[in-house]
């Protein structure tokens, strides 16, 4: 009997530890700036053990690649900022919480919003690591070694220092996915379905950066004659990556886990998602009202657009509760003039405008 009690207690503690780990995230590196590589003292382990939100596997990678951690933090921050831009006019606006969970309890639900957040943060890491390689900030990588594109004109040179998106992709996959791959849930369980969902969306985010990287060229020659061009691989602007992932969010596929431990479409009439698509396993919670159990902050106090019929319009944003009007003073640059040579001088103009907030 005592042995059964011990086994039950151990299982309970293991579940509690898993829940505690899941409540935190490596995303918290965005909110807690990581020291630059040159600032590390000898011996990485104490530094890595103090970083919040890392899983055991990610902590080991931190010890092996300590100089990467600052750029993982930058990538997470880039992803969060892009998330907030893309959802700035939605009921859920990608708000962050002041703790290691970053987004609060809302991320415990396998919704479309969670899918997008995983994708855009994984994309942010690929972006940051790829660029750090090009800039010579990491000892394990350098400029891109991508083969010369076949369609590049023969007289154009290939070999400028490009963004190392291959390395960025591989490292982001190893680090970001480590958290999911070390989990061991029963095959066909809801928990395993959530792991598969996260892995799919992480991959979709990484592929968005990888696929959108393109050839950039610079002209050389007397008086801008462009008699010679040097070309290299360059990352797309991250805003374009965010736009692409937002499109994937809008067309995300509803999935469920099978007994064999695979994800399948809830509606088999829809097209099977590719590795570049987002998937979700839970319906989105009600973002209209504040709900501590789901993590929804509600829309009370949010600004809305009285004349818009879209999601930012007062009718939809305020969920039919109505809105309050108030006057706001806005200061803008105006009457700008160019002076030779070479600067622009502007005046400051104030304007009183009507604004609206949800009840």
Swiss-Prot record:
Disulfide bonds join 83-94, 133-141, 143-161, 217-231, 219-226, 288-319, 304-314, 318-358, 334-349, 336-346, 341-342. It comes from Homo sapiens (Human). GO terms for biological process: canonical Wnt signaling pathway; cell fate commitment; cellular response to retinoic acid; chondrocyte differentiation; fat cell differentiation; lens fiber cell development; muscle cell differentiation; negative regulation of canonical Wnt signaling pathway. This is Protein Wnt-5b. Residues 1-17 form the signal peptide. Glycans are attached at residues 93, 99, 291, 305. Ligand for members of the frizzled family of seven transmembrane receptors. Probable developmental protein. May be a signaling molecule which affects the development of discrete regions of tissues. Is likely to signal over only few cell diameters. Palmitoleoylation is required for efficient binding to frizzled receptors. Depalmitoleoylation leads to Wnt signaling pathway inhibition. It is found in: Secreted, Extracellular space, Extracellular matrix. A lipid is attached at residue 223 (O-palmitoleoyl serine). Belongs to the Wnt family. GO terms for molecular function: cytokine activity; frizzled binding; signaling receptor binding. Keywords: Developmental protein, Disulfide bond, Extracellular matrix, Glycoprotein, Lipoprotein, Secreted, Signal, Wnt signaling pathway. Pfam families: wnt (PF00110).
